[in-house]
UniProtKB/Swiss-Prot annotation:
Summary of subunit composition and partner proteins: Homodimer.
EC number(s) stated in the UniProt entry for this protein: 6.3.2.1
Sites where the protein binds beta-alanine: 61
Keyword field: ATP-binding, Cytoplasm, Ligase, Nucleotide-binding, Pantothenate biosynthesis
A cellular component annotation (GO) from this entry: cytosol
GO BP field: pantothenate biosynthetic process
Catalysed transformations (reactions): (R)-pantoate + beta-alanine + ATP = (R)-pantothenate + AMP + diphosphate + H(+)
Organism: Shewanella baltica (strain OS195)
Pathway assigned to this chain's UniProt record: Cofactor biosynthesis; (R)-pantothenate biosynthesis; (R)-pantothenate from (R)-pantoate and beta-alanine: step 1/1
Positions annotated to bind (R)-pantoate: 61, 155
Record: residues binding ATP: 30-37, 149-152, 178, 186-189
Protein name: Pantothenate synthetase
Gene encoding the protein: panC
Miscellaneous comment as given in the Swiss-Prot or TrEMBL entry: The reaction proceeds by a bi uni uni bi ping pong mechanism.
Length: 281
């Protein structure tokens, strides 16, 4: 696998593949990779002739009191895992490469509406940071296909909306959430959990599953939401949000809606965990 922190190197290699009529898939990450990321890379390899990955801990998407400095950097292990999964080109830029004028003087990409609810309400500016860095990476790599995990459901919809609104010729593919045996969604932030917290953490998925089951049986949104929140609190979580939304727009779900998604974020110990369930009724 070729690794470079320089934009020109990435563009040169991709152009060489393009000159031979070959296709390119892209998997952007922040590193500290787990099996969910590896699944994205393997899926990417099945879609295109070549796979490009990136590792960049993006300061623009972290808030003032968030874990930017504490976010684990594990480049050597990540590189080995990416190579084994089928990535051929790895882009590892520094903040100076991506934001040479600094964050305050950087042009931003902002997706209105969908960026301002749920995680966007809890983390103001987060999705502006996500949309900006992903747009920049798309312009550098210019892939045919880009893959993202369904665990970050709101992020996936933000990126799909950005690609559609800006007429970017890229297919965005969401890949099913990879879970531990307990049902806990794999996340780089699971490393913050103590043994006791990790044992309690599967309650997040269990609460979401119970909500969906009740809604399918005709129970009210409000009743199932309150029951699920109570279960989370009993398990040691502090809920940030737990909501039922329209699956395509993330607008508040209405009783007549069929395409639904339950989205949750909750704190346990030092970790803020997110999960979701997309379903029809």
């Amino acid at each position: 696998m070729i690794t470079s922190a320089h934009i020109d190197d990435i563009r040169t290699q991709v152009r060489a593949w393009r000159a031979k009529g070959e296709t390119v898939a892209f998997v952007p990450t922040m590193g500290n990779l787990h099996q969910g990321h590896i699944t994205l890379v393997k899926e990417a390899a099945s879609k295109c002739d070549h796979v490009v990955a990136s590792i960049f801990v993006n300061p623009m998407q972290f808030g003032q009191n968030e874990d930017l400095d504490a976010y684990p950097r594990t480049l050597a292990a990540d590189s080995e895992a990416l190579t084994a999964a089928g990535a051929e080109l790895l882009f590892t830029p520094t903040p100076a490469v991506m934001y040479p004028k600094g964050l305050e003087q950087q042009t931003y990409v902002e997706v209105p509406g969908i960026s301002n609810v749920l995680c966007g309400a809890s983390r103001p500016g987060h999705f502006r940071g996500v949309a900006t860095i992903v747009c920049k990476l798309f312009n550098i790599v210019q892939p045919d296909v880009a893959l993202f995990g369904n665990k970050d459901y709101q992020q996936l919809l933000v990126i799909k909306t950005m690609v559609e609104d800006l007429s970017l010729p890229i297919e965005i593919i969401g890949v099913d959430t990879i879970r531990e045996d307990s049902g806990l969604a794999m996340s780089s932030r699971n490393g913050y959990l103590t043994a006791a917290e990790k044992a309690a953490a599967p309650a997040l998925k269990q609460a979401i599953d119970a909500m969906a089951a009740g809604i399918k049986q005709g129970e009210s949104f409000e009743q199932m939401t309150e029951q699920a929140k109570a279960c989370l609190v009993a398990a040691g979580f502090t809920p940030d949000y737990l909501e039922i939304r329209h699956a395509h727009t993330l607008e508040q779900a209405q009783n007549q809606d069929h395409a639904l998604v339950i989205l949750a974020a909750a704190y346990i110990g030092k970790a803020r965990l997110i999960d979701n369930l997309r379903f029809d009724r």
